[in-house]
């Protein structure tokens, strides 16, 4: 899947050339903001999230020109009452993958900031912390609605 040029996947050619080490360091630096909520990532866990992001980009065929989406997701969700130390990395991984899936399915009609804000509102609200509900019900409705409106401003509500 995906086009290749000279043995390299086309989407890989456009990834910003930040080293995984640099990206992981930026994620670990967020511990200062998340520790107050009892959430902390090790360097190995941060590297795992960098790899999840890279795999998600490849899977969806997306190209990322600016790093920082993982950090935005961490900042947005770190004070959720539904996050715990035990499932923090797994939850972040699922949110990263879901973010890329929605961006792809809506042809980028939703800005990153709006999508992250709406994911958080639904996660803490109608989904009560359920990633399955967020992915299966709410996000599918968001995708349908965003595509139907062609990207017009919208807010995710219980009746979305």
Residue ranges and their predicted role:
Residues 9, 22-24, 133, 154-159:
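Intrinsic disorder/low-complexity segments enriched in polar/small residues
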Residues 3, 145-160:
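Short acidic DE-rich linear segments
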Residues 2-56:
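Short terminal alpha-helical segments
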Residues 39-44, 48-151:
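Acidic, low-complexity, intrinsically disordered interaction modules
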Residues 1, 13, 19, 66-67, ...:
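Intrinsic structural disorder
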């Amino acid at each position: 899947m995906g086009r290749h040029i000279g043995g390299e996947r086309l989407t890989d050619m456009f990834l910003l050339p930040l080293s995984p080490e640099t990206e992981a360091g930026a994620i670990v630096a967020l511990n200062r903001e998340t520790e107050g909520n009892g959430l902390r990532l090790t360097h190995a866990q941060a590297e795992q999230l960098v790899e999840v992001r890279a795999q998600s980009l490849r899977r969806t065929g997306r190209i990322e020109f600016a790093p920082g989406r993982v950090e935005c997701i961490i900042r947005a969700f770190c004070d959720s009452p539904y996050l715990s130390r035990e499932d923090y990395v797994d939850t972040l991984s699922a949110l990263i993958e879901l973010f890329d899936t929605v961006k792809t399915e809506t042809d980028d009609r939703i800005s990153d900031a709006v999508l992250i804000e709406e994911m958080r509102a639904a996660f803490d609200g109608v989904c009560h912390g359920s990633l399955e509900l967020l992915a299966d019900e709410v996000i599918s409705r968001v995708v349908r609605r965003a595509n139907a409106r062609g990207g017009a401003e919208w807010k995710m509500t219980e009746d979305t």
